[in-house]
């Protein structure tokens, strides 16, 4: 089973994340941030990755530290669960509609972290959640999962829909990229013979 648990504790947050890449999309997200929990639920459901997140953070300051640190821990858990990445599909893309919004997500599970994020939010907040934190989460996740990730909202008018299409798009792209390729016979999908450098 491709599973991992990451525990991360700082003066700002105390986080435990568990993932099962070969799960059923079961989510148990408890960050204290309702909208963020909703996004993590979507990520689990549409990636078919079981995700458990327990986070206690300095929410009295703002949601930044908790959101970013969950991205760090979740990225580390995915990377650890992937092991040497033998047999995975590696590349995937998804065009994700959400009503009037359309977002393109392209991923390379390469061990080389990079993020291109192009999404503009009409509003500064979704409820109490700062929309700028969507990019912060994707940055933290990509850097720590070791993935190259391109996220581009082609058009959209509703901030909630834009955020949701980004997370759902990542979910479906990630689901495809980490899937085991039955034709690869356990080979690492790289002419170098390894991923990560």
Swiss-Prot record:
Its EC number is 4.2.1.19. GO terms for cellular component: cytoplasm. The keyword Cytoplasm applies. It is found in: Cytoplasm. It comes from the Bacteria. InterPro entries: IGPD_sf, ImidazoleglycerolP_deHydtase, ImidazoleglycerP_deHydtase_CS, Ribosomal_Su5_D2-typ_SF. One of its GO terms (molecular function) is imidazoleglycerol-phosphate dehydratase activity. Keywords: Amino-acid biosynthesis, Cytoplasm, Histidine biosynthesis, Lyase. GO terms for biological process: L-histidine biosynthetic process. Belongs to the imidazoleglycerol-phosphate dehydratase family. It catalyses: D-erythro-1-(imidazol-4-yl)glycerol 3-phosphate = 3-(imidazol-4-yl)-2-oxopropyl phosphate + H2O. Its main location: cytoplasm. This is Imidazoleglycerol-phosphate dehydratase. Pfam families: IGPD (PF00475). SUPFAM superfamilies: Ribosomal protein S5 domain 2-like. Pathway: Amino-acid biosynthesis; L-histidine biosynthesis; L-histidine from 5-phospho-alpha-D-ribose 1-diphosphate: step 6/9.
């Amino acid at each position: 089973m491709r599973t991992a648990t990451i525990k991360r504790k700082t003066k700002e947050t105390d986080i435990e994340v568990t993932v099962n890449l070969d799960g059923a999309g079961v989510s148990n997200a408890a960050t204290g941030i309702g909208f963020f929990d909703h996004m993590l639920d979507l990520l689990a459901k549409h990636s078919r990755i079981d995700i458990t997140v327990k986070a206690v953070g300095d929410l009295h300051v703002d949601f930044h530290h908790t959101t970013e640190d969950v991205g760090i821990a979740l990225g580390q858990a995915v990377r650890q669960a992937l092991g040497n990445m033998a047999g995975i599909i590696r590349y995937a893309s998804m065009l994700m509609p959400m009503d009037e919004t359309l977002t393109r997500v392209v991923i390379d599970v390469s061990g080389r972290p990079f993020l291109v994020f192009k999404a503009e939010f009409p509003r500064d907040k979704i409820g109490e959640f700062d929309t700028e934190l969507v990019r912060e989460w994707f940055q933290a996740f990509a850097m720590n999962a070791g993935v190259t990730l391109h996220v581009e909202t082609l058009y959209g008018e509703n901030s909630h829909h834009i955020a949701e299409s980004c997370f759902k798009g990542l979910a479906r792209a990630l689901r495809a990229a980490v899937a085991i390729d039955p034709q690869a016979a356990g080979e690492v999908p790289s002419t170098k013979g390894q991923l990560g450098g």
